[in-house]
């Protein structure tokens, strides 16, 4: 097998949470360009339909599941619908998540804390359970968890540490699952993005413009990442190009964590 052939995903199916827009949409496109069929999970039917219409042009099968993964029940339902398609899912990209609120930790309600943990952490666990069992039965699969550089560090100027805490836990879950499933054919790795030009981040910067410059000043490359710059990394981790790699995290942050 040639080096380039190791990156090919032809005939495999990838389940991408939050796959209809933002970083998830960009990663889904890269997986499709490498030959993977897609099952996109998202909350909004219109956004899913638009993504499906565009991605099928790449010559792959694209199915969509409208679901809200902010509850464990929603994640179970999404996985069940995907499995009911009768297509073996060999790649799971746990991308869905978000900060959503900017509240000081001392004022954070436990109800909201739990809800955001469900979104950023529990959804990944549930999807790994529901889709990981068939992978283990087949002895083959790759799971890619999207963590964040906010896992090992506290982002300056942002209040409320639910996101940092959940993403740190997702990194720990990545390593734990990797150790548990390594000799059963299922690899589990993570990507930790830095600050990227996405719609949610644009909203944050519009509401709090001082943060934009604060973050930019902390990036040695002097720019934010573009969503398509995550694509090659997810293809690498999903493919046989990383066949001897599990429990690892790729940090893609323009050097943010160098300082």
Model-based region annotation:
Residues 133, 179-183, 243:
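Alpha-helical segment proximal to the catalytic Tyr-Lys
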Residues 45-46, 66-78, 110, 228-229:
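The beta1-alpha1 cofactor-binding region of Rossmann-like NAD(H)/NADP(H)-dependent oxidoreductases
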């Amino acid at each position: 097998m040639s080096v380039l052939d190791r990156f090919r995903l032809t005939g495999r199916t990838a389940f991408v949470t939050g796959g209809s827009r933002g970083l998830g949409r960009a990663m889904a496109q890269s997986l499709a360009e490498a030959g993977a069929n897609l099952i996109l999970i998202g909350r909004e039917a219109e956004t899913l339909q638009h993504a499906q219409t565009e991605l099928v042009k790449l010559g792959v099968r694209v199915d969509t599941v409208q679901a809200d993964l902010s509850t464990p029940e929603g994640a179970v339902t999404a996985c069940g619908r995907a499995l009911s398609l009768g297509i073996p899912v060999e790649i799971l990209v746990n991308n869905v998540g978000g900060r959503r609120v900017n509240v000081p930790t001392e004022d954070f309600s436990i109800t909201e804390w739990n809800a955001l943990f469900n979104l950023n952490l529990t959804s990944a666990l549930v999807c790994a359970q529901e889709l990981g069992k068939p992978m283990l039965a087949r002895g083959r699969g790759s799971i890619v968890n999207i963590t964040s550089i906010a896992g090992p560090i506290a982002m300056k100027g942002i209040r409320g540490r639910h996101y940092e805490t959940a993403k740190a836990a997702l990194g720990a879950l990545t390593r734990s699952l990797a150790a548990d499933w390594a000799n059963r054919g299922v690899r589990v790795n993570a990507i930790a993005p830095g600050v990227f030009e996405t719609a949610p981040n644009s909203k944050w910067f519009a509401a709090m413009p001082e943060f934009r410059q604060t973050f930019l000043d902390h990036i040695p490359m002097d720019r934010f990442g573009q969503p398509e710059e995550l694509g090659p990394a997810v293809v690498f981790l999903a493919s046989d190009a990383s066949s001897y790699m599990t429990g690892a995290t790729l940090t893609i942050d323009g050097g943010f964590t160098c300082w």
